[in-house]
Amino acid sequence: MHGKQALRGNRPYQKAGTVIVAASCCWGVGISFVGMVHATQDPAARLAMLQRSRGPWIAGQFLAAAGTAAVPIGFVRFAQALRSGPAKTLATGAAAALVAGAPLFVVALADRASDLDKFAYRRGPSWPFLTYSGLHIGALAALGAGLLLSPLKPWTGITAAASAPAFGAILAGTKDIPPFVFYLVEAAVGAQLMRYEEPAAPVADTADAGRLGLAHP
């Protein structure tokens, strides 16, 4: 074949977005098992609900833990795909915050699965969840700034950046925040990454490569 062919390469943005969306959906499905327990105010009623649905509850916590652990992987891949510069630095910082915070929530989910009474009555220290939430909010702030410097559409970065102070105010005021809001924003970012049309990469044909002195497999 003569001339040049345009290839899309490895599509790193789209692959990163796929991981983020799939992991966020996994988290959402898992956390929805016995989902009404999160809206139930009475501890005794929460415990009774969990005891009636112990199997689905435990399975849901494992699914949510898998999603929690996998979401940061997608953002690590996104950061790796960016060219060196401020956007990459900010995205790397966001990914690092997510990686640091994920184990805290995974441990909390494992605790929920193993001790129904403790979760129903909201016993135990609050610092792991507060730290996880704080890291997540910091990650969204850095991610939003990084996205605004990336080739993606501006609304993606604006959404992430604007959510950070809003979520921070909620967390500071109530000492609590539903984690699904984090994954909703991140899934939206992932969906935009999946839709991003990455520039085609020109590839030299055999004759061109020979003239340029490039090696062939």
Regions found by a protein language model. Give the residues of each.
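Hydrophobic, aromatic-enriched alpha-helical segments typical of multi-pass transmembrane helices
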Residues: 2-217
